[in-house]
Each structure stands twice: as structure tokens, then as C-alpha cells.
Amino acid sequence: MNNQELAEKLLLMRTSQGQWEKLLIQDKLQKVRKFRHLLVEHRQRIAQALFFDSGKPYEEALGAEILPLAEACKFLEKNAAHLLRPRKIRSSDTPWWMFLQKSKVHRKARGIVGIIGTWNYPLFLNGVQIIQALVAGNGVVWKPSENALETNKILAELILATFPPNIFTELSSSRESGPVLVDSNIDFVVMTGSVETGKAIAKKCAERLIPSTLELSGIDSLLLLEDGDVDLAASAAWFATNINAGQTCMAIRRFVIPETMLEKVTTKLLELAKNFKPRKILMESQADCALPLIDAAMIEGAELKWPLTKSDIWKDGHFDACILINVRKEMGICNEAIFAPVLSVLTYKTIDDAICISNACPFGLCASIFTASQELGEKVALELKVGSVSINDAIVPHAHPATPFGGVGLSGWGATQGEEGLLEMTRPLSISIVSGKFRPHYELATPKAADSIPIVEGLLLALHAPTWFGRIKGWFKLLLSGFQKKQS
């Protein structure tokens, strides 16, 4: 679809989107429910498509794609009506000198949302963003990834079987479609992908002054504290390194542990590695990015513990999960995005050191903390420069349908998922109704403007002076000014 064809499509969508936005939220949510049920009915087709596209096994297709998308739909069914309802401003929050005013804040659809999709979780991540945009009343133009063609086809089919025509359009998955979409007359962009692509899109959006949500890469850390369960933390790190063959934005890349636990942690990781069968990764270019970073780290002093030789890392499209120890936070492998199963082990002496190591990375998507103390875990979590933290688990908690998902730094901005993700698809519209005819501020545009100075000054002192004496003085000045004005 070229620029002209897309422009014509958007003109038609504008009309349909306006009608869709006016539809009762309950009617929109009935369609979400139908879509959720279709996910269940077509689960085997979806799983087969995911396997065809990326080699994702059936259990992972169910647990990491279909189930979390269904849960995200159910969250909207239960909560969207409340979240999108107009919010009345309480009388107690209204300044008393605005006593004649009553205000409401409405949530309006942004209009047409352009979604540039990803390939690593093509059903879950794309599905959540599309459904949230539609529930908020938007039209959606979706540019799917060229690396998940079969899954894209089924997702589009289920959307079109559920929602009205002309509020959802799927573009070609070719790379050329992305710039065409961003240059078109859309109102908001949601993009999941690399830092480089995110920067290019941010620049394009800035030129048109349209907002965006960017969910970019991560180099997530797992912090094992002194009182944490070593076996559980090591198992979590291994799981979070290898899920989806390491092709997960919130995969654990840095395992930050007390230096006294290095031997115990390494032993556990090697035990897990020896019984693990590596999976084929989808994009060989990801191996091309990871291997030089591994080489550079080893030259700078890191030690490869698994696999036993460097030549065993990448064979026949299979990337064996790497375990590197003696890694330091300034190494490239801790600062450049990797989309392959590589786990770097870093050691620390104090908790402050651990926090410093985690925050040294320019990416800030997610993090995990393992500790026996919930209080300590939350205290450390609040110091981490990331968008989400899980305590005593990894990856899975971030898929909770009621929580926002998004990063800071080079991991992007904005949020998808949960309340924040839904509201991100809207803009606030405040409406204030003023009764009566008392409008003293109109005098500011008349020759009597200076007469209001004592009244406004008295009001300011009466309400905001730092001392009781000052506030009493303000009330006196206000009453005196009002009396003098009445006499005149």
C-alpha cells in the first residue's frame, strides 16, 4: 500500500472511527469477549502458526502468547468501562472562588493509532496493543513484522471477524510499510522494536508533533541479594535467558550476585546448562550482533563457562546459551542490546554496588530481585531505573494484565498493558460548566482592572499566606476591598 492508497484508506477510517468511538463501551467489550473466545477456539491453529514462524513449541505458544492475551482481554472486559468513564472533579478539590464551576475529565480516543508490530511475541504483544486501541475508541492501522507471517494472518483474521469493518487495517509486513505508516495522517504511534528504529520513529513523530509509545530493547538484570535463594535465583536467570531462545526484550542478560556466591551460582548454572537443548533462533543477524560482544568481553577479561568452547556457541542456526563470568559493568556486553541467550554474571560487595551495576546500563526495561525480605526487595526495587521490577521471579510477573509495561532510557517511553496502557490510547478532555452570571474576572479587560488588585491580593494572602496572622490579614483585606467595591 503506497502513500496515496493509505491516505484514501485513512479518510474512510476517520468516518468509521468517529462512529465506533460513540458506541457504548459495553458494546465494544462484547466484541472483546468474542475475540477472547475465538483465541480459545483457534488455539491449535495459532500455535501451529507460531511454530511455523519461529519454532515456538506448543506449551510456549499457549503459556506465553495465547493465555496472556486472553487475560489482557478479560482485564479490559472487567475494567475498561470504569477506567474510561468521565471523572467528576470533587467539590473539595475546587478552589472556593471557583464555586460556580463544575468540571469533568473525559477520555477521548486519540483518533487513528498506527501500530508497528514485533515478531518475537507476535500474537501477545501485537494483540494487546490492537485491542486496547480499539477499546479506547480508536481506529487502528497495523504494520506487522515480516518475520511472523502466519501468525499475523490469523491475528488479523480474528480481529476482522470480531470488530466492525474500516476501523482496522493491516498493512504489508514489508520494511517499507513502516515509514509509509509514520508519514501518514495518523494521530499516535505505538512501536515495539529496536533502539535504532525507535529513534527514527521518534524523530518522524517529533516533526509532526504527534505522540508515541516506544517499547524498545532491554538488557535486564537479576539481582541476587545476600539472603536470596541461590538455586531459585539461578533457575530464574537460566529460564529468563533462554525463554523464546533468548529473543525476549525482558530476558535476563545480567546476573548480579554477591562475590562470595560466585562458585555456588556458577555450579548451579552449569548444572542447568548441561541438561539444556538449545533452540534455533529466528534471525541469524542477532547472532552476528551477539558474537562480537562475547569476543570483546573475553578479550577484556570475561571467562566463558558455557559452552565449553567458543566454537560451540553458534552451530547450524542453533545458539547455545552462553554463561560468562568475571564480567564488568562497563563492558559492551552489558551496554549494547543483545537478542540471543547470553547471560553475563557480575559480582558485587555491597547492595549499593549491586544497584550501581544495574543502573549503569543505558537500558531500563525490567529487573528482578531475589531476597528473603520483601521489605528489602521493595527498597532496592525503588532504586532501580527501570519500568518494572519483579521480586523472587522473572519475566512472568511483567505479563500481569493489570500492570503497565514500558521502560526508561534507551528502552523507550510510554506504557502498554494495564490501566496505563489503555489510557495511553486516549487523550484527556476537561469540560467545565459555570452557572450564574457572577464573573468578576471580566473586569480585567476593562478600565477598572486595577480595582481588582486588593481583592486578588487579599484572596492570595487569605488562602496561601504561610502564617495565621498573614491569612487573617488577607481575609481582612479581602472583606474591606469587597465592601469598598460595593460602596463604589
Feature names for model-found ranges:
Residues 1-101, 275-278, 472-488:
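N-terminal Rossmann-like NAD(P)+-binding subdomain of aldehyde/semialdehyde dehydrogenases
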Residues 2, 163, 196-328, 391, ...:
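ALDH superfamily catalytic-core signature
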Residues 3-6, 25, 43, 230, ...:
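Residues at or immediately preceding the N-termini of alpha-helices
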Residues 10-11, 213-216, 244-249, 315-317, ...:
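Short, flexible turn/loop "capping" segments at secondary-structure junctions
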Residues 17, 21, 36-39, 43, ...:
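Structural signal for hydrophobic packing residues in well-ordered secondary-structure cores
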Residues 24, 223, 311, 318-488:
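Conserved C-terminal structural/oligomerization subdomain of aldehyde/semialdehyde dehydrogenase
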Residues 28, 73, 137, 168, ...:
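Residue-level signal for inorganic ion chemistry
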Residues 92-232, 348, 472, 476:
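Rossmann-like NAD(P) dinucleotide-binding subdomain of oxidoreductase/dehydrogenase enzymes
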